[in-house]
Amino acid sequence: MSYAADVKKELTGLRVHDGNAKAELSALMRMNGVSTLGIDQTVSVKTENAAIARRIYTLLKQNYTQIEVEVTVAEHNYMSQHKSYGVLLKNKVSDVLTDLGVDPFGLHPDIPDRILNQVDKRRSFLRGAFLAAGSVNSPEKANYHLEIFTTHEELAETLRLMMAEFGLPAKIIDRSGGYVIYIKRAEKIVDFLSTIGATQTMLRFEDIRMMRDMRNSVNRMTNAELANIQKTADAANKQVQQILFIANEIGDLDLLPKKLRDIAKARLEHPDDSLAELGDRLEISKSGANHRMRKLKALEDMINAGVTYDLNKL
């Protein structure tokens, strides 16, 4: 089961009172409901999630009396294991939709104030919208992403504003004949899941994200340390080669001034030391050790260039 499916499974197990249940149903009906007009008017809510189908059925039966509701199941084809579910409301369709603030003709997209006039109702509406057409990437993946899809531009903007009320800065893009409201920042995805009541899967998201970020941080630190070690080793090896070259050219390192002689011999004796470590051995600073090495490098350059030099003036 995917992470998104786990989130929806948790949401379908939440208990809600009547006002919040109707706000959730309103979103589900708006986003996934299909009305059939005529004498035998019906409305069917489609989903590929059995738990969501049961949720819709239960909320309808709990909030409306004397309604006829049935759940239908359809297989995509005989080779497929995927099924789709429909929750079919067979009577009192107009009464139920009116109570939920849903226009069966889709001519009035506005949501009545009574559906969203409390904070918990707005949370429930967002929950219904996510159950109907939402998805979220697993926190194991590199790209954090949560989205809700709708074919109605007005509803997309309503959802965006509703999310902003909860401190969730969502964006909207056009996609395949509809609109996607999405969040990319991991901490805001966590906040969204908390807002709609997915507490357990939210905590799981946070745990996985923190472990993943920690591993990445450790890897970055390790890579940086390895790079520094390699850089130090390369520099030390180059200095050893310079000192050996100078010793061969002048005949004896003892001919060097004391400060340069000390650093040269220390480097040959401790080829793996960093400049800071060499400085500690000679009781000088890292910058002092670096200054002396630069003088040895200058001497090497003069020898290579055939320039006359005076060891006593180095």
UniProtKB/Swiss-Prot annotation:
Physiological role: Involved in cell division and chromosome segregation.
Pfam families: HTH_WhiA, LAGLIDADG_WhiA, WhiA_N
MF-aspect GO terms: DNA binding; endonuclease activity
InterPro entries: Homing_endonucl, Intein_endonuc_central, Sporu_reg_WhiA_N_dom, Sporulation_regulator_WhiA, Sporulation_regulator_WhiA_C, WhiA_LAGLIDADG_dom
Source organism: Leuconostoc citreum (strain KM20)
NCBIfam families for this protein: DNA_bind_WhiA
Superkingdom, natural source: Bacteria
Family: Belongs to the WhiA family.
Keywords linked to the UniProt accession: Cell cycle, Cell division, DNA-binding
Name of the gene: whiA
DNA-binding region: 274-305
Name assigned to this protein: Probable cell division protein WhiA
One of the GO BP terms on file: regulation of sporulation
Transmembrane segments: none
